[in-house]
């Protein structure tokens, strides 16, 4: 039996129509929105709250936590608001919950002058530099956790975690699926491309987020229960589960954000199909940076990316032959047939409108 969940990062424009990032938005600006959103007590213990207490709801502020000289959080530099679903037994259930949570967030944010926009990489700021500079305690914390040393990337990028797990599957098999998804990631991610903006203008490709993050951030992360199942790698493939509900979870982290949630449904079905597939033999512990960067620039216009994406999609479709979830693959098949991603639409709109803000205002419609 499969289980599904989605974590979706939302960026905003403020009441002035400016992109609301850490340069002009405080933690309290976003927290006032989260404070107005409901708390569902039955969500726990499957949702992780975390030590700082920021992650109390289905919505929470995504950002960079600051410390004094102890583990007590004294501030959080905000980049946006994340929506997370509970664990669902169906893909449709996860999509329905995400959709309901998104509409509630949009309605609540509007009362404070914020409107959600589709962004997968900060269109103006390329690098996050903590101010004031990191203190000795913070530097020691980062040195202890190599993946946490990439704050300069995750604070300017926005993307989903697409989560699947399979009941009672031995952890060795779960890790093998994680290796498989890492290997085929360059051919999966173009279905989601939505980051064609960089440093105030158009980038020379379709996903600057993919181009910059690959090799430094995980493509897939598998949560394990015991230390002996950890595989040492940078970026990480495996991580110790922080709560029991995380054990055996596979998080696919490489995709750009989507404003059409049917693409998330398609991607979850694709991941499910690849987990079931017995024909594809590729495995990798760390993502192939070169292939991801080729993919990021050309997408499905690159013949190797297109052919391998076709192979991956076909393998998933074959594995789901008698599964009703096969229907969720339809949007991905359309994207592949046309070789057009969301980035293509955004580029065309930008060329017509001449403004990044005016372009992204037309997302989430």
Predicted features and spans:
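Flexible glycine-rich active-site/ligand-binding loops centered on an Asp-His dyad
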Residues: 181-189
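An acidic/histidine-cluster motif and surrounding catalytic segment
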Residues: 162
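Inter-helical turn/loop segments and adjacent helix faces that build the functional surface
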Residues: 165-177, 189-194, 261
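Acidic, His- and aromatic-enriched active-site or binding-groove loops in soluble protein domains
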Residues: 134-157
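C-terminal accessory/tail domains of diverse enzymes
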Residues: 1-96, 100, 104-112, 153, ...
């Amino acid at each position: 039996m499969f289980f599904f969940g989605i974590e979706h990062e939302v960026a905003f424009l403020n009441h002035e129509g400016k992109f609301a990032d850490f340069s002009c938005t405080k933690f309290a600006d976003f927290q006032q929105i989260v404070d107005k959103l409901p708390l569902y007590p039955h969500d726990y213990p499957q949702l992780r709250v975390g030590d700082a207490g920021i992650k109390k709801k289905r919505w929470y502020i995504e950002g960079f936590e600051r410390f004094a000289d102890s583990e007590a959080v004294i501030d959080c530099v905000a980049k946006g608001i994340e929506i997370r679903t509970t664990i669902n037994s169906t893909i449709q259930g996860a999509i329905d919950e995400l959709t309901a949570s998104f509409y509630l967030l949009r309605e609540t944010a509007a009362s404070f002058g914020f409107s959600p926009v589709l962004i997968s990489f900060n269109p103006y700021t390329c690098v996050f530099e903590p101010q004031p500079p990191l203190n000795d305690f913070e530097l020691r914390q980062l040195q202890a956790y190599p993946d946490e040393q990439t704050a300069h990337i995750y604070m300017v990028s926005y993307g989903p975690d697409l989560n699947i797990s399979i009941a009672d599957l031995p952890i060795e098999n779960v890790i093998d699926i994680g290796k498989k998804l890492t290997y085929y990631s360059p051919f999966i991610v173009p279905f989601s491309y939505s980051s064609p903006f960089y440093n105030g203008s158009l980038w020379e490709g379709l996903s600057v987020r993919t181009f910059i993050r690959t090799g430094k951030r995980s493509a897939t992360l598998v949560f394990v229960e015991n230390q002996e199942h950890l595989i040492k790698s940078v970026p990480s493939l495996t991580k110790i589960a922080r709560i029991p509900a995380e054990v055996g979870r596979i998080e696919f982290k490489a995709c750009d954000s989507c404003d059409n949630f049917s693409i998330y449904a398609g991607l979850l079905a694709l991941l499910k199909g690849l987990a079931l597939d017995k024909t594809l033999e590729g495995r990798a512990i760390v993502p192939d940076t070169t292939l991801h960067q080729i993919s990021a620039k050309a997408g499905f216009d690159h013949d190797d990316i297109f052919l391998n994406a076709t192979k991956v999609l076909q393998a998933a479709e074959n594995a789901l032959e008698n599964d009703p979830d096969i229907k969720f693959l339809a949007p991905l098949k359309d994207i592949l047939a046309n070789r057009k991603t969301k980035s293509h639409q955004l580029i065309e709109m930008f060329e017509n409108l001449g403004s990044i803000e005016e372009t992204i205002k037309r997302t989430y419609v």
